[in-house]
């Protein structure tokens, strides 16, 4: 029998262990779960979203406050349970997030695989003028307008601590 996910929603208190297990399974290790723990401890997380399916969480993403530019968010990590990967859940989650960013006027940056995130609405071209401690060639942007801002990105300290 086919199973379909429920609607994306904010993570609820008490779901941290389920998210931790999802991150460890999706990334085959603790690094992304450790990043989320560090972001939570530092107060950098702006929001955590889950994609439930039945009695489990099969998708997750976190948005964190950038140090600079003020008001910008960064997306990391994004995870989908290994047994449901390939069903475009990530693309759907990213599509809804990028639509929200455009409509709300919120800039969001992400570092990762271009084909994955561009399918969801992020743009590498718009990120071309950004300066970053990470490879700009793998940095993408979502948000208002079709501009290509010229700004310097400073990520939450938790990112550098895990390098």
Model-derived features with residue positions:
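A conserved beta-turn-beta hairpin within the catalytic core of GNAT-like acetyltransferases
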Residues: 66-75, 85
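Short, solvent-exposed loop/turn elements at beta->coil junctions and helix N-caps
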Residues: 36-41, 128-130
